Amino acid sequence: MSFYKNKQNHKIAYKSLKGRGLGIIFIHGLNSDMNGAKALTVERYARKNKLNFIRFDCRGHGKSEGKFEEFTISDWKKDLLDIIDNVAKGPQILIGSSMGGWLMMLAAKARPQRIKGMIGLAAAPDFGKDLYNALNKKNKKEVNTKGITKYTSYGFPFYLTKKFFIEAEKNRVLKKQFHYTKPLVLIHGLKDDVVKEDVPRQILKKVTG
């Protein structure tokens, strides 16, 4: 495992393989990390085919520095861009799982010359509003009055902040047409009970180019 120290002196944990051709970067989902089954499956494929590959932990996740509630989608976007700009070499294909699919779209918009393709695995861009609506009355009141609330999803408790929802709104990618001219693959299970099955259709409706 290696670490990249960003401008805030935070360490971002990552693992990489050196190989040939386009690079591949795997981006994990909310409250997941680079050691998830999907990330490791892609890594095995990259190793078998001798491809350049990077998986990393966003801050507040896995082995990277910080507490989850200290960061937002804006920070995790910066983490991905730091990996693209300072760790990865040359053109990249981004593979994003759930929230990682949102981050990959933000990165493709910010670094169009570097990103040559995107693969979304149950990609979940712009989920901030849906997540807020899933909160109960107590959670919503705490977010709006205290700025933070403890939320439990699928038996896993974590903290959500008012800033998290504000930054989520600022970073929406499907609010208007999303100009993108490179290959895009969206893989989504029809029985997914976390990310709605109409999300990939919404993405395709907004992507132009």
Language-model regions: role of each:
Residues 31-43, 198:
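The serine-hydrolase catalytic nucleophile loop
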Residues 39, 43-65:
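Conserved alpha/beta-hydrolase
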Residues 88-98:
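Alpha/beta-hydrolase fold nucleophile elbow
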Residues 1-18:
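N-terminal cap/lid segment of alpha/beta-hydrolase-fold proteins
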Residues 114-206:
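The alpha/beta-hydrolase serine catalytic core
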Residues 101-112, 118:
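Short glycine-enriched nucleophile-adjacent loop
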Residues 62-87:
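Catalytic nucleophile-loop/oxyanion-hole region of alpha/beta-hydrolase
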Residues 21-29:
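Short beta-strand element of the alpha/beta-hydrolase
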